[in-house]
Amino acid sequence: MAVKVSIIGATGYTGAELVRILSRHPQAELVALTTQSYAGKKFWEVYPHLYGYNQLTCEEMNLPEIMESSDIVFVALPHGHAMPAAREAARRGRKLIDLGADFRLKDFRTYEQWYRVEHTARELLAGAVYGLPEVNRREIREAWLVANPGCYPTSAILALAPLLKNRLIDTSSIIIDSKSGVSGAGRGLALGSHFSEVNENFKAYNVAVHRHTPEIEQELGRIAGEDVAVTFTPHLLPVTRGILSTVYAKLAAPAGEEEIREVYLDYYRGEPFVRVLPAGMLPQIKWVAGTNHCDIGLTVDRRTGRVVVLSAIDNLVKGASGQAVQNMNIICGLPEDTGLAGPGLYP
């Protein structure tokens, strides 16, 4: 029997990517797509590339009706907007996957400090599971409320998890340098994402104050078993999709590149979407575009005693909607790669 799925906020980039993936998912049936801006329009009128794949009409949000008709509800809205839906899901015994930030941070005070929004569903935070399958698969399997990770945190945590789990680095030395495509800024109009502002340009933004910082530190700390503080600098690339993160850390003891690579291969053995690349091969965003893969490459700088790890993901797939569907598959007891398998487009 197909899993009945609804998407709240279907016409943003992450919502549309959910529709694209779920429209070809063999075990999912889309039953409702909500939007504030396009109610009454066919979804393919908003996103013509899905003409012939989806015939649903966009509708205004009616939480009781959505929960009644759905097994799983995805919320693809900006932070601050998932709390009412999560409360309704809790009341009706439905499962909800939030692609925003409302349930990622366990301390509501940290959330309110970084996002400048009051958290009105604090009672649900303890039961929310951080939806990074490679780290929390067992908890996701039993979850009713999944906080889908942010795009930058996904790339950073997957790059660092094996090192922290095996206590191979000095946790006070971590530097994360990430570059993202423009789709990470969303579909809304903003000066910083206009073509003439982005084209032939490359810039850092929100240096030392990006909202994903506490999320990265929280989850790295859970893996390490101790508090972790990082220096995180995001950059905007003049491309549509992709995140490339370069992570630097001081080794706790001397180790060679092949020794470190074996740690990664062992940690990610059996993972359907993490590809640890061979020696001499470093990830590129073009290799993962349109896929749920995370490619990881590494090297050891013996001169400085630092390990350098690079990870590449598609920010809209593994960094958002693909990972959300991966979480749905886990919750529903389906093979994790259902609807997600296969290479991307190249070139």
From Swiss-Prot:
UniProt cross-references to SMART domains, sorted A to Z: Semialdhyde_dh (SM00859)
Protein location: Cytoplasm
GO cellular component: cytoplasm
Record Gene3D superfamilies: Dihydrodipicolinate Reductase, domain 2 (3.30.360.10), NAD(P)-binding Rossmann-like Domain (3.40.50.720)
Coarse class of the protein's main subcellular location: cytoplasm
Catalytic residues (positions): C151
Reactions catalysed according to its record: N-acetyl-L-glutamate 5-semialdehyde + phosphate + NADP(+) = N-acetyl-L-glutamyl 5-phosphate + NADPH + H(+)
A Pfam family the protein falls into: Semialdhyde_dhC_1
Keyword field contains Amino-acid biosynthesis: yes
InterPro entries per the UniProt record, alphabetical: AGPR_AS (IPR023013), AGPR_type-1 (IPR000706), NAD(P)-bd_dom_sf (IPR036291), NAGSA_dehydrogenase (IPR050085), Semialdehyde_DH_NAD-bd (IPR000534)
EC class: oxidoreductase
Gene Ontology MF annotations: N-acetyl-gamma-glutamyl-phosphate reductase activity; NAD binding; NADP+ binding
Pathway of action: Amino-acid biosynthesis; L-arginine biosynthesis; N(2)-acetyl-L-ornithine from L-glutamate: step 3/4
Gene Ontology BP terms: L-arginine biosynthetic process
Keywords: Amino-acid biosynthesis, Arginine biosynthesis, Cytoplasm, NADP, Oxidoreductase
Enzyme Commission designation: 1.2.1.38
Residue runs in coiled coils: none
Family assignment from sequence similarity: Belongs to the NAGSA dehydrogenase family. Type 1 subfamily.
Function: Catalyzes the NADPH-dependent reduction of N-acetyl-5-glutamyl phosphate to yield N-acetyl-L-glutamate 5-semialdehyde.
Name of this protein: N-acetyl-gamma-glutamyl-phosphate reductase
Source organism: Pelotomaculum thermopropionicum (strain DSM 13744 / JCM 10971 / SI)
